[in-house]
Amino acid sequence: MALEGISRRTFVEGATVAAAFAGTMTSVQAPDQALAEEATETLSCDVAVVGLGAAGLMAALAAADEGAQVIAIDSADDFEGTTNTHTTGAWMIESEEQLKYDHYLTQQQAFEWVEPGTHYQCNGKVLRNIIRSSAQAANYLIDGGVQFLYAFAGTTEEDTMLNRGGHVYLEEGTPRADNFRAMCADRETLTTMFGYKGVELVQNDEGAVCGVIAESSDGTVRIEAKSVIVATGGFLANPDMIKEHFAGAVLVNQGFGHNDGTGIKMCQAAGAQIGKNFSVSCNEMGAANLKASPAYSWAPGRGTNPCFYLPLFGNVLVDKRGERFMNEQQMAEQTMYSGEPMLRDPYYYTIVDQAYVDTVKSNPVFDFLTEGTKANMGGALLMGFEGVTLSDFEANIEEAIEQGWAAKADSIEELAEAFGLTNLPATIEAYNEACAAGQDDEFFLPADYMHAIEEGPFYVFEYNPGAWVTLGGIKTDGFCRAVDSNNDVVAGLYVAGVDGDFWSTPYYQGGSCNGFALASGVLAGNTAAKDLVA
């Protein structure tokens, strides 16, 4: 358990709290008798924030800056335990740094890119307001000392949207967490409490949310609040919810294991309606496997097995039946959201031959990346590939074989047996014929991606889709107020980040997961604080 930023104005307990709330709140229902009896202390604030990742941190800062007394909790031990200290970058709009350039990405351009790009699946009102809140979120980070590479520097309207909105983090872990701690410490009315997991919302007799029950290793705490913002990071660590919303998919969780869906379920129990769109922010490096150690790769030079890079090179992909299922160019060039087809099966596979392995280990990685792939990855990840040749590729393959997620065989028929890929021989025969003809009539893969698989021995690699977070959850109005099944506001309840029904299927713009989480946190924090005096 860790307690940071304690202010005498925000940290009040015991009988003092009960007396203070007697004149301002209706009677509070005990959400769970056992939890109520176990509560060892009671705290009071204006706004309680559940979760201190990207959205929760911004919500806490924004609410405090609007004059609210804020208590923000997280189940992690510290900021280092939140995924937000390890994310790659944020897609943001009209930050103070962007405005220094003539051709900066405008709010209108961002909206007109995202809304039609998602086929109008987004909540248009909340998308508009998230975009409007983006600059405040970006400036919190910039002014707070977070170091960025500004991918938008010098761009024009002809450049990719990824670069035009790109704020790429140059630090991770403790250096980034130190900045977050300093931001919180600078606000007298903000208390952060780590090692506390929100488990249930408190409601009054009218159904308004007026607090949260939190558990820690030291006991149960009741936080009484005039409003609660839930921003707990989705449900990637909840296998049952993954099966429910992603049709039995097996996902490698690249986050930190605290995102188990509790926040979404708390909101549902309080009467909030869950939305219809569920997606994932996929691993931008193409692949993962639960048998591997580490289980995924998300940037070059991270000590992970480069066999995970193969989908980025456009190699043939098959499902557990040994059959192709997509145009592999999509995986190479739109990695963040082309992971959607992978969710249809727990596993997918790529196959290469010895000739390809020999080529990979003797040529720079850049030779295997198309211009489309490079544009999709962005400058920060590309820098990691500068001058890299996978000279130890065969040793990497042997490691994958030892860990059980790769196999080697002298024939395609024998290779198929390793993972039960029944139709693989016929698939490779048809693929080789397409390579010879220079035309793929099955999934229309461009010829420059195609290379025959003919020279044994042959190799197969098994992958699970990897993801940073799930996307999708509780419906809100245009200002992050949770709504019920009638689209009426659940009083006192706000939702931010990936716990909200803010995204489309599939996830559309790379970097907007972190960027929109940050901005929605600002929006929720501003709204919750302003609603107190409305």
Question: What residues fall within each predicted segment?
Answer:
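Conserved redox-cofactor binding core of oxidoreductases
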Residues: 132-219, 239-240, 287-288, 295-296, ...
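N-terminal secretory signal peptides and thylakoid transit peptides that target proteins
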Residues: 1-19
